[in-house]
Amino acid sequence: PENVFVGASAFYGSNELAEVVFPRQVRGVWKGAFEGCAQLKTLSLNHVDFISGGAFQKMPAVERIEVNGWRTFAECPQLKRVDFRGVVLGTGGPTLLADCPRLEQVVFHGDILSTGLGAAEHCPLFEGYTVKGKVLRSQHKDFVPQVSDEERLEGRGLADFMSRFAPVVRRIWAHGGGVMGYMKKTSAPWFYRSACAWASEGRDEEALAHLDIAIKLGFAKYDLIKGGKEWDALRENPEFQALVEKVREVGDYLYVLKKSPAYREDARPMPAFTYQPPTDSNLVRVRRYFNLDSIAGDGDEISQIKNLMYWLHDAIRHDGGSGRPDCARNSIAMYELCKREGRGLNCRFLAQVLNEMYLAMGFPSRFVTCQSKAYDTDTDCHVINMVWSRQLGKWIWMDASFAAYVTDENGLLLHPGEVRERLIKGLPLVLNEDANWNHKTKQTKEGYLENYMAKNLYMLDAHLESRFETEPADGSGSRQIYLVPEGFWPLSEYATYDDRYFWQAP
């Protein structure tokens, strides 16, 4: 059918597929949609709104993947001019134009909320984009300038500006359409800010209308709406209260976690998690390269585990916006790249480096990806380490991104599952006093545990095999196991509801 969304692992292991031809319009293709389709040779898509990272992977027989329609105006030899009437919610980008040899002008007659427009390809007569209105946000300002700092829209000016876009969004919904994910992400905050502006002026009807749009577009910052003084006059308004409750259902992360279904036993035979021994030649090399024995020190096991984490926290800064490192995905290569380029690593790669350091020292360890209930739209996950303490006979939480670990009220170190359970039950948690982000921002229990990690402890996953280069750059890593609340996903070879299985001792 038209306008389908091909979800994660949608055709996983469908060995009967040899060729797939999609209709004219596809909403999106998600990670691993065709993974394991051993006979699939040809994929053909036309207009596709979104292709996820990892959408096309582990397809051993595929010979051709064809994507047509990604350029909106292409191969139109007689086209001279394009006019957009009215306001534009978003353009996507960067390539709108290609292979139009007579094209001279593209004119936007109204305002643009967000644009990613860049250079035209093979359009020798093209003079550039003309925008007769205002552009609130432009990713490529050399091609489409946005409002200057002096013109920055605030208060009533922003409210009036966003009011011109509200009918566009409502019209899309009225016709059964949807606003694409990236447009939701860019437009929801602006509608919320305009709602606040209307509320500050006592324009309740406009404020509630814009707040409703912001929420439908994905606004989920419960703390903002709960604490915003501009909403004080509306606190007793039933319509406002209903809207706040909608935000709470997705944005009050501790509330969402507490409402999650419980885990339960999974009687299926599942493979054991494994840990590469420190005698492996690559791990021996890691131990020698970093001089890990010196870093760990001569203290007891817990002090050694902490020392390794603290050393990495200081050696490589956390940079959540950094891309994938262009090197082999092992601790030595990533460390050398960071020193050579003066760059940092995001939480995933920091956790991979720490994982190899722990394994090299003989501490069984996994890096655990922690994700929110809205994992399919929320890209802000977090990755930490769980390392086995023989001294305590249990897993413990170590986070090199924030130099963080967690204990109960008696000082007992906890693992991610125990932290999750205590958040749900409202039991005491203690974050180490020196937890911090790059020695710039102190971390608190309220911010780090009760907000950020409460959001990201809804769903957990880890690789079955923990080893040197657990996630190679070619994507050939071992299978991942997801621990999810009962009923959140169907049980599969990848998903379990059994927390005891997931936290099994090495």
Locate the predicted segments by residue.
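Structural signature of tandem-repeat unit edges
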Residues: 1-5, 15-28, 38-50, 57-70, ...
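Hydrophobic/aromatic-rich core segments of domains that either
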Residues: 352-428
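Low-complexity, Gly/Ser/Thr/Pro-rich intrinsically disordered linker/tail segments
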Residues: 425-506
